[in-house]
Amino acid sequence: CDYEEARADKCQELLKKASMPKAAVYSGDKGYEELCKRDDIDLVYIAADWLHHFPVAKCALENGKNVAIEVPSAMNLQECWDLINLSESTRKHCFILENCCYDWFEMNTLNMAQHGVFGEVIRAQGAYIHNLSPFWDHYWKNGENDKLGWRLDYNMKHRGDVYATHGLGPVAQALDIHRGDRMETLVAMDTKSVVGKELVEKRTGEEC
């Protein structure tokens, strides 16, 4: 399921390479609604642009589906509570399947920590350094007049670490944060935007 049918069709190539049958394709602005209405699926995995995470998850839960959702699961606190309440009322799971917490490397490292390979973990350091320059053109754009795409537009309007769980999540898991221990203080800092600012101004022709 993808907003753009061509992107959804391209995924069929992966199935073909794996010697698997073609999947049903759903596309367009409301394609996910048709997908969620099916009675032969149990779980909807959401890896769309961030603004669509909540409406797709809400639709899936309302149609009796379990939900695995990429980070962030919602764009504000009210949407978070809406998902919690909906999950509880429908008795369906709504799980944040954070790719940098549950990828093979992170799960392997967590397994090693839990089995004492590192001894008693008393200090940890994590990071997520990611140059997005090669990817800006691959993010979904809403029509020909959208020069930035959803991701660059979001970075332009918001400051700071927009998905801190990439670097912090695996460390918190290894330290059992919220599984017997908890954070008492959190300090966050960032620098001014340089490369992103230049890129936005180059694409829009406007100073930001």
Labelled PLM ranges:
Residues 12, 33-36, 45, 57-61, ...:
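Non-transmembrane alpha-helical segments in soluble domains
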Residues 18-24, 89-93:
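A short helix-to-beta-strand connector/capping loop
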Residues 23-42, 46:
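A structured beta-alpha segment of the ubiquitous adenosine-cofactor-binding alpha/beta core
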Residues 10-11, 56-58, 79-80, 135-138:
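Short, solvent-exposed loop/turn and secondary-structure capping segments
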Residues 43, 49-50, 54-102, 116:
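Beta-strand-loop-alpha-helix segment that lines the small-molecule cofactor/substrate pocket
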Residues 90-95, 100-208:
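Predominantly a Rossmann-like dinucleotide-binding segment in NAD(P)-dependent oxidoreductases
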